[in-house]
Amino acid sequence: MVMDKLGSSLQDALKKLVGAGRIDEKTVTEVVKDIQRALLQADVNVKLVMQMSSHIKERALKEEVPPGMNPREHVIKIVYQELISIVGRSADIPLKPQTIMMIGLQGSGKTTTTSKLSRYFQRKGLKPAVICADTFRPGAYQQLKTLCDKLNVPFYGEVGNPDAVGIVERGLAELGKNDVLIVDTAGRHSLEADLIDEMEQIHEIAQPDYKLLVLDGAIGQQASEQARAFNDSVGISGVVISKLDGTAKGGGALSAVSETNSAIAFIGVGETPDDLEKFEPDRFISRLLGMGDIKSLIEKAEETLSEEDIDMEAMMRGRFTLKDMYSQLEAMNKMGPMKQIMQMLPLGGMGAKLSDDAYKVTEDKMKGYRVLMDSMTEEELLNPRLLGSSRIKRISLGSGSSPDAVRELLKYYKMMQNAMKGLRGGKFNIQKMMKKMGM
């Protein structure tokens, strides 16, 4: 998950509201203090934290609770809205032909982000191409070329040529027929005069529609100074916060965006080419607070899965079979790591509480279930009631497993079957919950 520790701390703070008999000033003050502590530990700017804390307390104690909402839900909604105000709006990078210039310091994850961005446009049906203008860092050309080759993205660069401006000029001519041209510029260990001069010359030649500053999610408080310097030099259209998965604090980068009045365009949430997400403030905060992110989950499923992969409507209408469960497991495997998928489900932050080891064990168990089902007949997959002791023994032998493993699979299947019945019966009214929060 993005910013695991911050998300867990914020969720713990809001739990105090659940146990409170009534929402009074003392309870609100305690919750606000816990939120302050969580944000400051994540490197969020002190001034921003204090402003937000004041707003939460004032609104929670003075605003009238809207009809259909209890006081606890109202305070949670206020926290949700005020956290969104900290991260600000999102920078909208449209899905159309354009030129994008990538800027940032060395080590920010700029080159990897460039390849991920090309993959993002590729997934959306556009034809991206990449120009390597980083002539400063040894290995930059080969790294970016390798990443682009794996994605079948057209690439232009010149090994050993220090003339970055000339490379960009020739690259634009060579790759101009593609929809989205992404120029990866050189980084430095600090914002030096020669880097600024080179960036300004490339900017003049490329005439980019958008300039994206890549900031390392773990950068801390110096992020604001960097963002201001780059903004003064060539201007910033948007920010990409990289390495925001796992333990990254992220608060410094988020503060930098707020202080420079810019906006976040994308966030890096993992190591694979597909782990770059368009930044949506409401969805980001929803995930942090353990409320899930159903919209992103649906979008990910639409991008990754075909209609044949999983037929949710059919499952919701009729019987849920082992064959349906097999399709579910296959679909989840295609959509990415289980940890990312779990964070998108509104499970009250349950996903955030699981350790990486727990996720690994769960993923291994799901793989084992698929192996067991591969040893079943079509008739057994469609009608699990047929699975008596003799069939269970045959399946365990055919899969190299034990009868107990088959019984564990059937127990999991029963649990999933009951969950589907609950969804059909409206026990988990996700839409109602999201509507209450204004999502």
UniProtKB/Swiss-Prot annotation:
Disulfide bonds: none annotated. Coiled coil: none annotated. One of its GO terms (biological process) is SRP-dependent cotranslational protein targeting to membrane. CDD domains: SRP54_G (cd17875). Keywords: Cytoplasm, GTP-binding, Hydrolase, Nucleotide-binding, Ribonucleoprotein, RNA-binding, Signal recognition particle. GTP binds at residues 104-111, 184-188, 242-245. It catalyses: GTP + H2O = GDP + phosphate + H(+). It is found in: Cytoplasm. One of its GO terms (molecular function) is 7S RNA binding. It comes from the Archaea. GO terms for cellular component: signal recognition particle. Composed of three domains: the N-terminal N domain, which is responsible for interactions with the ribosome, the central G domain, which binds GTP, and the C-terminal M domain, which binds the RNA and the signal sequence of the RNC. Belongs to the GTP-binding SRP family. SRP54 subfamily. HAMAP family: SRP54. Involved in targeting and insertion of nascent membrane proteins into the cytoplasmic membrane. Binds to the hydrophobic signal sequence of the ribosome-nascent chain (RNC) as it emerges from the ribosomes. The SRP-RNC complex is then targeted to the cytoplasmic membrane where it interacts with the SRP receptor FtsY. Part of the signal recognition particle protein translocation system, which is composed of SRP and FtsY. Archaeal SRP consists of a 7S RNA molecule of 300 nucleotides and two protein subunits: SRP54 and SRP19. This is Signal recognition particle 54 kDa protein.
